[in-house]
Structure formats: C-alpha cells, structure tokens
Amino acid sequence: MNVSQVSNHIVVIKLGGSVLSSKDTSLKDIAALKQLGLKPVLIHGGASTVSDWSAKLGLETRLVNGERVTDDPTLDVVAAVLTGLVNKEIVAALLDMGVQAAGISGVDGATITGQMRATETGYLGDVTAVNTGLINALLDKDITPVISPVSFHHTKRPSGSRRLININGDPAAGEIAAALQAERLVFMTDVPAVKGKNGEALGEISAEHAAELLSSGTASGGMIPKLRSCLKATLAGASACIIDGRIPHMLVRELTEGNCGTTIIGQHLRRS
C-alpha cells in the first residue's frame, strides 16, 4: 500500500490482547500512522486480562466454541476490565506518545448495538447495528477512537435482562470497518498468516478463497471470526489483512510496504 494514496483515510485496527505486551510496538506504529496522515480507529480485546481478573475473584471461566460464557458476574468483570482497565491503559499509552485519543465502548453513543446469541452463553451477543456518529465526531477533531467491544444490549432484549452485552472484538471490528467504509481493516494477531488446506502460509487471497477456507473447515478456532470480519469489510469496499503483531513495527510495514501477512481482497479491488 502506498500511504500517500490513502492519506486521511480510515484504517480500522483490531488489537488482540495477546499483542498488548510491554515489548509490543503496535501503539508506536499507530502514532506513526497518525504522522503519515491516516485515521486509525482501534478496537481492542483483552480476554486474557478478563480471565486473570475472573480467577482473582474466584469466577470460573467457561467457554463454548472458544467464546466466553458471560453470566451476570462475568459480565461485570468483562465490562470493568475491558472498558475500564484495558481501554484506559491503551488510551494513556497513546497520550504518552503524543496521540490525542479517547476511550469509548460500544455502549457510548450506541456505537455498537447487539443482541444475545443463546441462553447457554448468557450475555454473549452479536452485532445488530453500528452507529458511527461518535466515532466520526472524534475523527473530525483528530482524536483517535479506542473502542471496547462491551456494547448496548437493546435488540430483542428480554424483559428484566441487563443493558450491557459482551461482543467478540473480531466481529465488532469488521462491522465497524464496514459501517465506516474504511480503507483497510487490520487484525493484529499472534500468528504469521492464514494457513491454506496444506498448512501453507497464504499471502494475498480473494474474498472467494477466504469464504472457501471457512466453508471447508480449513479455517479453525480464532481465525474463523477474523476471516468472517474480513469478508464483511471487503463487501463494504475495504481490503483486509491479518498480520503478526508480535513482530516489531509490523503494522507500519504492512501499511507502507504490504505483503506482511494475509491480505483479503474483494472482487472490486482485484488486480487485472
């Protein structure tokens, strides 16, 4: 990607909790992207921190299909840890680097509205709507939004249930990228690339190829929601990529040089 061609364009970046360590350079890269004229929008996870605090409080972590069962006490921890601790640590780090940043959650401004998925997973939900008003207001003031995926439980909310809902940050990132009509969606992960059916690392692939990886069962575990989100973003006009956030300055390299992980290209963006 030639940065000069996308100056002032929106790049949605999903930060996995596993890449937010003391040695990680992702936030420094975001500061550099701001200097290059891009408009980063950050969505973060923090599952390991939630699990740590759950253990400290004597709460059992239960997973269904790799996702956290979110009962009442767990929702308290998720909301406090993601929207409070993790979100504000990221914002403080960016401020310390000279980046004007503001931490919000999906609840604020009804940025992300969701509904419960199933009774057995409690307050774990899916995105039903994205309101970009608050995000755009921050971007217009040159403030970088840092978004926790704790969201507004409103759609088909059962009587007497809580107004907060826990939404996986991966699908949230794809929905936000699509709603903003972002130029790029970038997933910072702890794997080098998406793997093909023979275990090979994949570079640039079409959206159709990504869909085939999902339908065939080749993609598994945490790669499934990431690829689904990439497809959502490509349908809205973005390109999407999955890169290894553990490698120093990988984000800047991807957005200036490209070819750093796996890039998913929609049909309208495919090279002739």
Swiss-Prot record:
GO MF term set: acetylglutamate kinase activity; ATP binding
GO cellular component, as recorded: cytoplasm
Main location: cytoplasm
Site (Transition state stabilizer): K14, K226
Binding positions for substrate per the UniProt entry: G46, A47, R68, N166
Keyword terms of this UniProt record: Amino-acid biosynthesis, Arginine biosynthesis, ATP-binding, Cytoplasm, Kinase, Nucleotide-binding, Transferase
Gene Ontology biological-process entries: arginine biosynthetic process via ornithine; L-arginine biosynthetic process
Enzyme nomenclature, EC number: 2.7.2.8
Highest taxon in the source lineage: Bacteria
Cellular compartments annotated: Cytoplasm
Enzyme class: transferase
Family according to the record: Belongs to the acetylglutamate kinase family. ArgB subfamily.
NCBIfam families named among the record's database cross-references: argB
Primary role: Catalyzes the ATP-dependent phosphorylation of N-acetyl-L-glutamate.
PANTHER family (alphabetical): N-ACETYLGLUTAMATE SYNTHASE, N-ACETYLGLUTAMATE SYNTHASE, MITOCHONDRIAL
Protein name listed in UniProt: Acetylglutamate kinase
Organism: Dehalococcoides mccartyi (strain ATCC BAA-2266 / KCTC 15142 / 195)
Lineage, highest ranks first: Bacteria, Bacillati, Chloroflexota, Dehalococcoidia, Dehalococcoidales
